[in-house]
Amino acid sequence: MASSPGSTPLAALLLLALFSASAASRFAPVDNHLIACGATGPAVLPDGRRFIPDTGCASMRLRSESSTLPTAAPNAPAAPSPLHAAARVFSCHASYDLAIRRRGHHVLRLHFYPFDATLASARFHVGAGGFLLLHNFTASSPVVKEFLLPVDTDVLALTFVPEAGSAAFVNAIELFSAPEELVGDIGTLVDGDDIIQTDGLSSQVFETLYRINVAGHKVTPFNDTLWRTWVNDEGFLVNKESSGSKAWSFGGRIAYPKGSKLMTREVAPDNVYNSARSVNSEGNLTWAFPVPAGNMYLVRMHFCDIVSKALYQLYFNIYVNGRQAVKDFDISGTTGYLAYPYYIDFVVDLEDEGLLEVAIGGSNMSRAGEVSGFLNAVEIMRMNQTGGGMDGDFPAILDMDYLFSKGIGEFARSLLCGLLFAGLFLVLVTLVVRLRTELKNNGTLWSRQSMDSGDGKLARAYQLVPTKTDY
């Protein structure tokens, strides 16, 4: 069928309007540093973001005690991402100073792709804003480390500290302003048998360990407004064949509340809420995640009722590490809508355990044989320790806010200058004392010997030293 005259321009206008609306709704951070470290030219990703080289950028400067080396990856095999084609290698302390236009929480991602043996064996520390992020870190395989940290200065110093005899490196840096709704201040503390409300979460630093899309496909940065990656839950599901377990997929529209500052697509994208796993009143589902022991964790569980046909039909229990964190959870009473996203933040202290488990199970209020509970997604983040470190403490001389705010190179230079000044002052005092002693002793000896001896050598040797006989 032939198209009518003018349909092509009309279609083009409609597409342009749709594209403009989509672009306008996409998250645009105030601070947005995208840096290709060691690169000679820009690196453009499939999601459209453009990373610029770490030299010649007005909003960023690189400081180091000695020259840093831009290193290019070998031609074969080809790097899986344009960000992995080069790296910046540090043989000593170095800092990136990143300008901050809006203070508050920022997302920081550090890309490590060790394309040679030197990088794979490098061992170093990384600090930012007075916090130790990585301690004795080695990237023997490709990895992206993501952090969510509060920034209260106009310049954020991102510092790399190689271990003695080793090097430090980084392939790419992302630092951008986080939306306010991404970080809440209140959570539920699961501490033994006590389930209590806790606050102060907004002042913490978080390291993302897991971001799971339950029963859904992998979500890439191309489909996430904050350029996150969500992986499928299959590898973490303990009892997939639990009674009444079912995977769900939703083709409708997720009902984000208009004008809400709490729930937006920046908290989690549609692709995360469009899938879920459910259990019936007799069953339960458990997910297990290996984590380092001796840390506190934020567990964020996402819920969006895409399984019910009507409101007020679901009641279920939520468990964290075997403890009942929420009893008879009523998602309809909480949100008042179907397909309406919601999340709960739990705080867990793992002193000796190296495994973190979350689970959903049927409630006594559930209808027998009917769908009872569900889960759409889960995020697990490690929280910073009281000493400001994510993974242990820095050596005492390095664990200083001044060091991170001013830069390690400047601190070391200041310390060296102070030591040199003190040494010179001590030498000067010693010389003055010795000179005064010699003036006194040698002056008396010269006067006596010049009268008793006819040898003039002693007088010539000390002829610039006056004595009483010279007046």
Map each language-model feature to its residues.
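Compositionally biased, intrinsically disordered or flexible polar/acidic segments
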Residues: 2-471
